[in-house]
Curated annotation (Swiss-Prot):
PANTHER family: CYTIDINE MONOPHOSPHATE-N-ACETYLNEURAMINIC ACID HYDROXYLASE, INACTIVE CYTIDINE MONOPHOSPHATE-N-ACETYLNEURAMINIC ACID HYDROXYLASE. Its cofactor is [2Fe-2S] cluster. The lineage of its organism: Eukaryota, Metazoa, Chordata, Craniata, Vertebrata. This is Cytidine monophosphate-N-acetylneuraminic acid hydroxylase. Binds 1 [2Fe-2S] cluster per subunit. Sialic acids are components of carbohydrate chains of glycoconjugates and are involved in cell-cell recognition and cell-pathogen interactions. Catalyzes the conversion of CMP-N-acetylneuraminic acid (CMP-Neu5Ac) into its hydroxylated derivative CMP-N-glycolylneuraminic acid (CMP-Neu5Gc), a sialic acid abundantly expressed at the surface of many cells. [2Fe-2S] cluster binds at C54, H56, C75, H78. GO terms for cellular component: cytoplasm. GO terms for molecular function: 2 iron, 2 sulfur cluster binding; CMP-N-acetylneuraminate monooxygenase activity; metal ion binding. Its main location: cytoplasm. GO terms for biological process: CMP-N-acetylneuraminate metabolic process; N-acetylneuraminate metabolic process. It comes from Macaca mulatta. Pathway: Amino-sugar metabolism; N-acetylneuraminate metabolism. It is an enzyme of class 1 (oxidoreductase).
Length: 590
């Protein structure tokens, strides 16, 4: 087993002033303490960065005066040229790609350049691929991001979401899972759960599993926000959760091992995995934006990744200003196309033998979310696979529930008719009904909770949340299903500069957001101390903002940095009872 845990190394820090002064195009920087040089490329859409070292023979890059577009740099040793906007060498063409660094903004709008170390941990203790027998390695698609892998005499399952909703009540399964899904889970030797989002960490699914096998081994990465941070609150009895370090092979048996890697954009919560059996690698990048900081193994046997888009409330839940229906439709169309092209290019660069798009098969099926369902179009996996096949020799697989890919057969002969076994004729592929009521009842139970009889819950909750010293005023409005004010619901302001709750907006200049939230979901989130992804990614809000600025610190805090334990409502209610009615506004816990 490898002995070096993968860590994040800070290579360069830029102050907020230096970030504000970055010019469009190429920027050169030196870390004075280390003497190392770096290049940052700024465009309207993103920042890219790399070490100022030519891959050919380690020369230093300088500005390419022949490039009028201002995108390329020239090596001082042999005149090799690098297009920093794409990180590809253009002289000589088709030679190398420059390794990118992770660009991360800090809480003060400063900038960090980060590198994962070691960058390619899967290269430790390499193994040569052995020939696979037919049927020795089989991958069966269950639904969304859930795969059942037979690896010799071991079985491994990825991200089991097989019943119930995700993100409160906003996402429901598009595909009908095979009827034997629970048996498959119970027979697994181990389960990998990539991150804490409820389309991957499904407590309704795990509750069913825990009733039969509470001791099933579950593996997660050592993320800053623990994947199972809410296990005790969930009531699900699982007794064998294993948190493993990044970038270290975990040996299952003599032929099987796996390695969990972090995401370069969301290392605090997102992970991906490499599974290796007899030297054949299966790469699952799941939802990672830049898995392993963009450094991934090439020519793996099988690669799978998300593809669909639409996993955000933006822009569907926004209104006012530019957010017309025409603007939204054009934005969504453009973004989906960009994602499709990015995935196709990634597959072309990595050259896996087989590629499978998955982890995007969800639908906004509750009738109250009809607008979201119609507006939030997703990418078609077949369109992506056709695009991949145009530009490479990669074999593609669009999975259907219960379909099984035989890796040994496909690697030996991709035309083998038994390489992919489709589900039997007549098998139900798409769900046409969902059991809404049990899950909506859980949410609705929070509406009448005693907590909300006392208006001081507002101060209690936002004090617990711990976000302050930021110039933003938010108006929170509880609503009905159609986002109209809920009769008797709360409508209040929060000034996060001093964490006060004014009756009117302050006179000073301040950014302003209005957040309308369905009362059942917001109260469920507040009562249980849940992350606001339930609201935002679950399409349970409608938002307006002035000016039209994304407040990263605010949303990042409420989506990922809330306390790990919920508010102490029992103590709060005791305090309110002791103080009596009429003074609950002053009630607070210690």
């Amino acid at each position: 087993m490898g002995s070096t845990e993968q860590t994040t190394e800070i290579l360069l820090c830029l102050s907020p002033v230096e970030v504000a002064n970055l010019k469009e195009g190429i920027n050169f920087f030196r870390n004075k303490s280390t003497g190392k040089d770096y290049i940052l490329y700024k465009s309207k859409s993103r920042l890219r960065a790399c070490k100022n070292v030519c891959k050919h023979q380690g020369g230093l890059f300088i500005k390419d005066i022949e490039d009028l577009a201002g995108r390329s740099v020239r090596c001082t040793k042999h005149n090799w040229k690098l297009d920093v906007s794409t990180m590809k060498y253009i002289n000589p063409p088709e030679s190398f790609c420059q390794d990118e660094l992770v660009v991360e903004m800090d809480e003060n709008n400063g900038l960090l350049l980060l590198e994962l170390n070691p960058p390619n941990p899967w290269d430790s203790e390499p193994r040569s691929p052995e020939e696979l027998d037919f049927g020795e390695v089989q991958i069966t698609y269950l639904t969304h991001a859930c795969m059942d892998l037979k690896l010799g005499d071991k079985r491994m399952v990825f991200d089991p979401w097989l019943i119930g909703p995700a993100f409160a009540r906003g996402w429901w399964l598009l595909h009908e899972p095979p009827s034997d899904w629970l048996e498959r889970l119970c027979q697994a030797d181990l389960i990998y759960i990539s991150h804490l989002h409820s389309d991957h960490l499904s407590y309704p699914t795990l509750k069913k599993l825990a009733g039969r096998r509470p001791d099933i081994p579950i593996y997660v990465g050592n993320t800053e926000r623990p994947v199972f941070w809410n296990l005790n609150q969930s009531g699900v009895q699982l007794t064998n959760i294993n948190v493993v370090p990044f970038g270290i092979w975990q040996q299952v048996d003599k032929n099987l091992r796996f390695m969990i890697l972090m995401d370069g954009v969301h290392p605090e919560m997102d992970t991906c995995i490499i599974v290796e059996y007899k030297g054949h690698k299966i790469l699952n990048t799941v939802d990672c934006t830049r898995p392993n900081g963009g450094r991934l193994p090439t020519k793996v046997a099988l690669m799978m990744s998300d593809f669909a888009g639409g996993a955000s409330g933006f822009p569907m839940t926004f209104s006012g200003g530019k957010f017309t229906e025409e603007w939204k439709a054009q934005f969504i169309k453009t973004e989906r196309k960009k994602l499709l092209n990015y995935k196709a290019q990634l597959v072309k660069n990595l050259q896996p033998r087989i590629y499978c798009p998955f982890a995007g098969y969800f639908v906004e099926s509750h009738p109250s979310d009809k607008y979201i369902k119609e507006t939030n179009t997703k990418n078609d996996p077949n369109e992506l696979n056709n695009l991949i096949k145009k530009n490479s020799d990669v074999i593609t697989w669009t999975p259907r529930p219960g379909a099984t890919l035989d890796l040994g057969r496909m690697l030996k002969d991709p035309t083998d008719s038994k390489g992919i076994i489709e589900p039997p004729e007549g098998t139900k592929i798409y769900k046409d009904s969902w059991d809404f009521e049990p899950y909506l009842e859980i949410l609705n139970a929070a509406v009448g909770d005693e907590i909300f009889l006392h208006s001081s819950w507002i101060k209690e909750y936002f004090t617990w949340a711990g976000f302050k010293d930021y110039n933003l005023v938010v108006r929170m409005i509880e609503t009905d299903e159609d986002f109209n004010p809920f009769p008797g619901g709360y409508d209040y302001l929060v000034d996060f500069l001093d964490l006060s709750f004014p009756k009117e907006r302050p006179q000073r200049e301040h950014p302003y957001e209005e957040i309308r939230s369905r009362v059942d979901v917001i109260r469920h989130v507040v009562k249980n101390g849940l992350l606001w992804d339930e609201l935002y990614i679950g399409f349970q809000t409608r938002l307006q903002r002035d000016p039209d600025i994304y407040h990263h610190l605010f949303w990042n805090h409420f989506q990922i940095k809330l306390p790990l334990t919920p508010p102490n409502w029992r103590s709060f209610l005791t305090c309110c009872e002791q103080n009596g009615p009429g003074i609950s506004q002053e009630c607070k816990t210690t």
